[in-house]
């Protein structure tokens, strides 16, 4: 089994990279998204939940994430939490059953900020992209998926996304074994990474 960490800023193309690697390694990959492991905030009033900074490492339940990655490594099945951005809370009744696989991809903007999690990874990949390109993708995503206007999306980027990127995400790039420039558009890099993973599996 290989544990692959894929990090990078919001809108960098991580999802595209993960999808392409998963496609090339058909049937061998399970993806564990960081976004499923935000801390449960159901005990907070709704107005307090809206103030949560999802781009800060403190928002992530790294203890549970590390525990479940360790369980997958041991060949155990896990019950992955289900988190709702709408209610800012973890489902009390629903989980996703995840079986072990040859390749476990742990994906998210903050996955390199936790040493305990990094230490479980065999390969660490950072997806890099131009700030302007990331901003455009973030605005489109926030409007289409999170109900924001252009103005509120830009405000969110300026007040939260960019400062957290500079403070936590960009510095975590130094932990990467591989940096993919041009984000999800870099087909050559993605092909090389998929081939490298295949070789590593073969050599285990």
Where in the sequence are the language-model features?
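Hydrophobic positions on the alpha1 helix immediately C-terminal to the Walker A/P-loop
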Residues: 17
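Post-Walker A helix-loop "phosphate-sensing" segment adjacent to the P-loop in P-loop NTPases
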Residues: 23-32
């Amino acid at each position: 089994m290989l544990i692959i960490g894929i990090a990078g800023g919001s809108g960098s193309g991580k999802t595209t990279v993960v999808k392409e690697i998963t496609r090339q390694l058909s049937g061998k990959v399970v993806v564990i998204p960081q976004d499923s492991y935000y801390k449960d905030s159901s005990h907070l009033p709704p107005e307090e939940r809206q103030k949560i900074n999802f781009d800060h490492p403190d928002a992530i339940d790294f203890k549970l994430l590390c525990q479940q990655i360790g369980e997958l490594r041991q060949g155990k099945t896990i019950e992955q939490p289900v988190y709702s951005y709408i209610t800012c809370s973890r489902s009390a009744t629903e989980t996703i059953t995840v079986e072990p696989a040859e390749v476990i991809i742990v994906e998210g903007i903050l996955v390199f900020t936790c040493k305990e999690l990094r230490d479980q990874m065999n390969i660490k990949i950072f997806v890099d992209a131009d700030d302007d390109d990331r901003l455009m993708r973030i605005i489109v995503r926030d409007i289409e998926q999170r109900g924001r206007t252009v103005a509120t999306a830009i405000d969110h980027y300026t007040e939260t996304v960019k400062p957290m990127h500079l403070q936590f995400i960009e510095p975590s790039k130094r932990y990467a074994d591989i940096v993919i420039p041009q984000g999800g558009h870099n087909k050559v890099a993605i092909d090389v990474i998929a081939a490298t993973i295949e070789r590593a599996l073969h050599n285990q």
